[in-house]
Amino acid sequence: MAKFASIITLLFAALVVFAAFEAPTMVEAKLCERSSGTWSGVCGNNNACKNQCIRLEGAQHGSCNYVFPAHKCICYFPC
């Protein structure tokens, strides 16, 4: 019986140690996409689109996406 109790205690201690090392998860806000209001022409440079969305429009990020009939700069904002 004493051996069983020590095994249970050891398992509980291991569970506590593993739980202590688990990284907390962060919940990210959902992002909504919107065509850039400041971009003109066809979007061919993802980095330039991203920088323009962040700096000029206050978006989280941006990228060139195909929206019929051409690639457009799309900015991503919190919903």
Curated annotation (Swiss-Prot):
In its UniProt record, which GO terms are filed under biological process?
defense response to fungus; killing of cells of another organism
Q: Name one Pfam family in it.
A: Gamma-thionin
Q: Which domain of life is it from?
A: Eukaryota
Record's keyword terms, sorted: Antimicrobial, Disulfide bond, Fungicide, Plant defense, Secreted, Signal
Gene Ontology CC terms: extracellular region
**Carries keyword Lyase?**
no
Intracellular or extracellular location(s)? Secreted
Among Gene3D superfamilies, the record links this protein to: Knottin, scorpion toxin-like
Disulfide linkages recorded for this protein, renumbered to the chain, are: 32-79, 43-64, 49-73, 53-75
What residue stretch is flagged as signal peptide? 1-29
User: What family name appears in the similarity comment?
Assistant: Belongs to the DEFL family.
This molecule's function is given as: Possesses antifungal activity sensitive to inorganic cations.
Q: Spell out the protein name for this chain.
A: Defensin-like protein 3
Its source organism is: Brassica napus
